[in-house]
């Protein structure tokens, strides 16, 4: 089983415009609302690829039933810590050139009691998990150390995967050795101090993670594909050419597919190929909708990997 831990769920409102004109009237051409959160997106991706998944994290009571309905329909088992209040709303504004502008809310505060409940719940659920994924931001008022506290208490036998910004990543790395991280180019540069100009720079930058005990680095290069490295072997997979509707959720889709590959024990090349196929398939959907398996399989058949 794959466990996902989502500390900061969101309702993502994706707004389509001809172009975004700041300080002027903008007319909406399309709008899609999805019940989201990075680790919840991972859970959906895992389930769509046919593997069992349990989703936990904080969930705000006023929208909890809707979130759980959406996730249950995807075949995901839900076991959240209920909190008073409303789920934050994030706005994703996309123009006809696929330029994305994001306006993200921070969410409501979570009490110390609820924080302790999630630490215990994640610990308990991880006892039956093979892989645990924690990703995304934290609600208002939570210190980055909370990432470390959750991860520190997970079962010692579970493989831990983290996709988070630098401050939360550092807290996670201080808690235990991580099985895999998934930085994008900006996150990789910020963490390592290495400017990414060519593929070999990705390998050099990844060494900073290996020094912290990380086993695998899955580096997302956007439209250029991705690199998967363990410090000894490194592979590159270029994305397939597709019509891009929205890049939101592509990284979460990559994490989902990579975790499924890890769970099934496939070689590094296949983990990478599956991750790139899922991420590429995700950008063909509107809003924050994730990939569908038919599109994933079609793109997968077109991809090639190369050893660096």
Residue ranges and their predicted role:
Residues 1-56, 64-66, 238:
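Glycine-rich phosphate/adenosyl-contacting loop at the front of the ribokinase-like
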Residues 3, 54, 79, 133, ...:
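Structural detector of well-ordered beta-strand residues that form the stable sheet scaffold
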Residues 24, 48-129, 297-308:
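Conserved N-terminal subdomain of the carbohydrate kinase-like
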Residues 44, 91-93, 225-229:
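Short beta-strand scaffold segments in enzyme catalytic cores
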Residues 46, 184, 251:
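Short, conserved phosphate/pyrophosphate- and ester-handling motifs at nucleotide-, phospho-/glycolipid
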Residues 102-104, 129-136, 163, 182-187:
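Short beta-strands and strand-loop turn motifs
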Residues 145-232:
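Conserved phosphate/ATP/ADP-binding segment of small-molecule kinases
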Residues 171, 199-308:
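Conserved phosphate-binding/catalytic region of the ribokinase-like
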């Amino acid at each position: 089983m794959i466990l996902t831990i989502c500390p900061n769920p969101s309702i993502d409102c994706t707004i389509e415009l001809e172009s975004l004109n700041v300080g002027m009237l903008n007319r909406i051409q399309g709008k899609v609302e999805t019940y989201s959160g990075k680790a919840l997106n991972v859970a959906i991706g895992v389930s769509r690829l046919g593997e069992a998944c349990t989703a936990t994290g904080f969930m705000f009571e006023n929208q909890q039933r809707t979130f759980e309905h959406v996730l249950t329909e995807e075949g995901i088992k839900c076991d959240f810590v209920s909190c008073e209040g409303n789920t934050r709303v994030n706005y994703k504004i996309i123009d006809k050139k696929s330029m994305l502008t994001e306006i993200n809310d921070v969410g409501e505060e979570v009490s110390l009691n609820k924080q302790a409940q999630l630490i215990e719940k994640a610990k308990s659920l991880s006892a039956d998990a093979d892989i645990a994924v924690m990703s995304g931001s934290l609600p208002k008022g939570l210190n980055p150390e909370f990432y470390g506290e959750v991860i520190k208490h997970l079962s010692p036998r579970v493989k831990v995967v983290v996709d988070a910004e630098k401050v939360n990543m550092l807290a996670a790395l201080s808690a235990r050795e991580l099985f895999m991280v998934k930085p994008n180019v900006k996150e990789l540069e910020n963490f390592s101090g290495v400017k990414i100009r060519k593929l070999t720079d990705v390998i050099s930058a990844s060494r900073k993670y290996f020094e912290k005990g990380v086993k695998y680095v899955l580096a997302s290069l956007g439209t250029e594909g991705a690199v998967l490295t363990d410090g000894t072997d490194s592979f590159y997979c270029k994305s397939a050419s597709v019509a891009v509707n929205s890049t939101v959720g592509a990284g979460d889709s990559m994490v989902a597919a990579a975790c499924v590959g890890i769970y099934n024990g496939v070689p590094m090349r296949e983990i990478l190929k599956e991750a790139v196929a899922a991420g590429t398939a995700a950008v063909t959907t509107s809003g924050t909708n994730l990939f569908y398996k038919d599109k994933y399989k079609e793109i997968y058949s077109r991809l090639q990997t190369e050893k660096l």
